[in-house]
């Protein structure tokens, strides 16, 4: 597995600088990868992989956490229309409890790459952990603010997960999933205390495991 020392200097790159430097190394099909939902008490962790055409412009695309829900949805549609390929993967609460959140996140990222209709020859990954694939790759801390491909993936992952959690609102009423998307806010914690965990709660997470009955 190859790694590149792309930025020996401290100069802050533009959102396409990582992609441009990787292309100059001879790679043509670069996938940005990010996840949404590592921290919540309920629901899956969702990962997205996005391959953008060379030179594409996506005004407004940045780290999904910095965008309003309305803007994220608008940019989701723009990315889906502009990208060369988009793949989405997920790991449910059961898998998270079984193998831990880090390994479940990497599994979701691996699945997202496998769902791409174009095989990538290089991966740019948000964070510090590499995906278990024999594809050249680089991890980038805060990559969703530094790479356009990763920023696009962060929006796809976030919107995809939010929509899934809104669907869970009707399947598991009483927890308020549409509002908090599974995060551990006061109202969600109160609902867990009153109703107990449901099927999509992460039963090894603090805030949930205290309410898991022994027979479960």
Curated annotation (Swiss-Prot):
Its EC number is 3.1.26.4. It is an enzyme of class 3 (hydrolase). A divalent metal cation binds at residues 34-35, 126. The keyword Iron-sulfur does not apply. Its cofactor is Mn(2+); Mg(2+). HAMAP family: RNase_HII_B. Belongs to the RNase HII family. Its main location: cytoplasm. It catalyses: Endonucleolytic cleavage to 5'-phosphomonoester. GO terms for biological process: DNA replication, removal of RNA primer; mismatch repair. One of its GO terms (molecular function) is RNA binding. It comes from the Bacteria. Manganese or magnesium. Binds 1 divalent metal ion per monomer in the absence of substrate. May bind a second metal ion after substrate binding. Residues 28-216 form the RNase H type-2 domain. It is found in: Cytoplasm. It comes from Geotalea uraniireducens (strain Rf4). Disulfide bonds: none annotated. Endonuclease that specifically degrades the RNA of RNA-DNA hybrids. This is Ribonuclease HII. The keyword Flavoprotein does not apply. Keywords: Cytoplasm, Endonuclease, Hydrolase, Manganese, Metal-binding, Nuclease. Signal peptide: none annotated.
């Amino acid at each position: 597995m190859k790694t590149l020392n792309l930025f020996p200097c401290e100069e802050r790159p533009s959102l396409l600088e990582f992609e441009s430097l990787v292309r100059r190394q001879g790679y043509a099909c670069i996938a940005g990868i990010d996840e949404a939902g590592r921290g919540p008490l309920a629901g899956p962790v969702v990962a997205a992989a996005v391959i953008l055409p060379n030179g594409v412009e996506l005004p407004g695309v940045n780290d999904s956490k910095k965008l309003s829900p309305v803007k994220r949805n608008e940019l989701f549609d723009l990315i889906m229309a502009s990208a060369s390929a988009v793949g989405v993967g997920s790991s449910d609460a059961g898998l998270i409890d079984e193998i831990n959140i880090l390994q479940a996140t990497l599994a979701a990222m691996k699945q997202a790459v496998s769902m791409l209709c174009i095989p990538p020859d290089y991966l740019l990954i948000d964070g510090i952990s590499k995906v278990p694939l024999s594809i050249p790759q680089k991890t980038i801390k805060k990559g969703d603010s530094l790479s356009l491909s990763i920023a696009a993936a962060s929006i796809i992952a976030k919107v995809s997960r939010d929509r899934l959690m809104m669907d869970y609102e009707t399947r598991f009423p009483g927890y308020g999933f549409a509002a908090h998307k599974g995060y551990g806010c006061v109202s969600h914690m109160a609902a867990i205390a009153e109703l107990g965990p449901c099927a999509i709660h992460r039963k090894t997470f603090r805030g949930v495991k205290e309410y898991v009955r022994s027979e479960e």
